């Protein structure tokens, strides 16, 4: 028996398809999302509707974004969901969530079992629309969730941690074993809730500067910031901000990265790389 076939659909490796089929896990996720009628609910990658059906049961209208044309067509003809669905058959990586929020007249509640092969770049795409998003609930590779929630001084802490926590309050919800999927992935999974900050705890003047600093620091994470960020900050400037130049990228807090970004935005012209 081909374990890549589920409900008559052959899971496509290039789309990173693993279909959720554990009812306890499904119920737990839907309970965490707690969808309500009248809310602008948006699902990324509905697949075979494991989450779409129980969420859709509670709603009058649901928007879904599905890249796989066969799955999009299948949803279109779904016996009870079909009439409730607005289906965008396209790549979520190119989707304009800001336009959709404007069209729906309220911030979006986004959820989904994200394809693990694009989960990190998709998170960065979504972060650029946090003004248009109320909250997000995602099934991700457990290692990615660990990175999202990690604090300084840990191996999991990296650029994704800093940028996610700059934009959102990040809350782990549930761990999910490979056996909850068909075909079972080779990794453990977890569900995470991301709630964009209503008021930024660490405002920055130019998020592009924060992005550049974190990229340069974590690309050379074993180096001290005296070396990895030496082209941007002198030892005197770092010391003046109360930041030890002998620290590595993983030792610096989100607040300190934001402090550095604001200094650079005020005192230097960001050179586009």
Curated annotation (Swiss-Prot):
Catalyzed reactions: adenosine(1518)/adenosine(1519) in 16S rRNA + 4 S-adenosyl-L-methionine = N(6)-dimethyladenosine(1518)/N(6)-dimethyladenosine(1519) in 16S rRNA + 4 S-adenosyl-L-homocysteine + 4 H(+)
EC number(s) from the headed UniProt entry: 2.1.1.182
Keyword NAD: no
Any one of the GO CC terms: cytosol
Gene3D superfamilies assigned to the protein according to its UniProt record, in alphabetical order: Ribosomal RNA adenine dimethylase-like, domain 2, Vaccinia Virus protein VP39
PANTHER family: DIMETHYLADENOSINE TRANSFERASE, DIMETHYLADENOSINE TRANSFERASE-RELATED
Known function: Specifically dimethylates two adjacent adenosines (A1518 and A1519) in the loop of a conserved hairpin near the 3'-end of 16S rRNA in the 30S particle. May play a critical role in biogenesis of 30S subunits.
Protein known as: Ribosomal RNA small subunit methyltransferase A
Organism the protein comes from: Escherichia coli (strain SE11)
């Amino acid at each position: 028996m081909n374990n890549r076939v589920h409900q008559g659909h052959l899971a496509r490796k290039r789309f990173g398809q693993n279909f959720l089929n554990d009812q306890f896990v499904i119920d737990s996720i839907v309970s965490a999302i707690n969808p309500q009628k009248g809310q602008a609910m948006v699902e990324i990658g509905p697949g075979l509707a494991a989450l779409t059906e129980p969420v859709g049961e509670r709603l009058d209208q649901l928007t879904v974004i599905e890249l796989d044309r066969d799955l999009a067509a299948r949803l279109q003809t779904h016996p009870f969901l079909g009439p409730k669905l607005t289906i965008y058959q396209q790549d979520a990586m190119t989707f304009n969530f800001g336009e959709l929020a404007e069209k729906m007249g309220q911030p979006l509640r986004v959820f989904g079992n994200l394809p693990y092969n694009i989960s990190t770049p998709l998170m960065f795409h979504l972060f650029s629309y946090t003004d248009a998003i109320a909250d997000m609930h995602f099934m991700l590779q457990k290692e990615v969730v660990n990175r999202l929630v990690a604090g300084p001084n840990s191996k999991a802490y990296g650029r994704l941690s800093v940028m996610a926590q700059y934009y959102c309050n990040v809350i782990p919800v549930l761990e999910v074993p490979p056996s909850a999927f068909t075909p079972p992935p080779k990794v453990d999974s977890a569900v995470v809730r991301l709630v964009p900050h209503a008021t930024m705890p660490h405002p920055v003047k130019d998020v592009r500067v924060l992005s550049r600093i974190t990229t340069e620091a974590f690309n050379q994470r074993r180096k001290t910031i005296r070396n990895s960020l030496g082209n941007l900050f002198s030892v005197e400037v770092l010391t003046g901000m109360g930041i030890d130049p002998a620290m590595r990228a993983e030792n610096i807090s989100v607040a300190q990265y934001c402090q550095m970004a604001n200094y650079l935005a005020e005192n230097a012209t960001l050179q586009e790389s």
